Each structure stands twice: as structure tokens, then as C-alpha cells.
Amino acid sequence: MNRTRLKMIGTLALTLVGCAIAQQVSKHILGSEELKKAVPTEYFYRGQKAPVQLRNAVGFQLADGKMAIAALVDASGYSTAIQQKYQGLLITETKLNIGGSSLSPGQYGFGFAGDGKFNVMDVANNDVLSASYQTDQALQHAVPLKLIEDGNGYKLYAGKKWIAIKPE
């Protein structure tokens, strides 16, 4: 009887340890299924909702489970002035360093401007952050939006333009 009880307790303990290990999150770039769950279908910005392009969505999750996501939006319903600034959404649950500038957790719009700046705006279209982006002329296959790991951070690409993003 004692052996049976010990086996049951041992099995239960191993099961609990296995469940705890399975629930641990490791830092990673989000896959398509994770993005489907996290990315909104529409995004409110400057008094309007814009459809979000899920096919052009990227993100990462940190070891503590917090996420940051970016996606392009269809900004055709906005004024020309806003379309020139606002290309996508940026939602972060953690503080970020973007091109050397700090960004608090929150929901934002972003855009790679023609003047060489990556701009982040609050949802009222007020500028929050501006940093110089880089251009990768050697990039063979540019895509609308891509995220790659880069040391302790990431590079967010829009075509051949990119900006460094690091969780703080």
C-alpha cells in the first residue's frame, strides 16, 4: 500500500513539474498562430478605425510573457498628411528602446517617413518618438514588414528600411 501511494505521489509530482516547465515562456518571435490571437482586425487611430493587415504583422514575446506587436494598416481613409506619417500600429506591453529613444508600454501608430525618420505617434496623432532609421541596400528580398532577432534586440524592417528595437 505504501509503495502504491509513493508511486502515485511521485507520478503526481512529475506531472506538476512537467506542466510548470511546459508553461514557461521563452523569448521568441511570434509565429502566425500567435499573431492571429494577438493582432486586432481593426485599429483605432485619430478618430477612425483602419483595417489591420494580418499578413503584414510581426511581434515578439519576452520570457516574462509580455509582447510587442507591429502591423501595417490600410490608411486609405485618412488625410494625405496622416497617410504620410501613419503606416502601422505598434502595441507594446513592455518598455522599448527604439533607435536609442525610450518608449513606454502602450498603443501607438508608426511610420517610416521620407526624411529618414521612424516616427511613433499616440492614437491622437501626436508625435511621441522620432529616431533615424537605417537602409539595408544589400537586402535581396524586401517585404512590407519583417522582424528579425539581432543580439539582445530586434530589427523592424519595412522594405529595406529598418530600426533597432530593444526591450528595456
Question: Predicted regions span which residues?
Answer:
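Short, solvent-exposed loop/turn motifs
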Residues: 67, 97, 102-104, 127, ...
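Short acidic, glycine-rich loop/turn motifs
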Residues: 19, 60-64, 96-97, 120-124, ...
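A generic structural signal for short, solvent-exposed coil/turn residues
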Residues: 14, 52, 82-84, 102, ...
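Mid-length scaffold segments of soluble, non-membrane domains
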Residues: 75-123
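Acidic, glycine-rich flexible loop segments
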Residues: 110-142
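Primarily secretory-pathway and cell-envelope proteins
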Residues: 23-81, 130-168
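Bacterial N-terminal signal peptides that target proteins for export
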Residues: 1-10
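Hydrophobic h-region of N-terminal signal peptides that target proteins for export
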Residues: 13-22
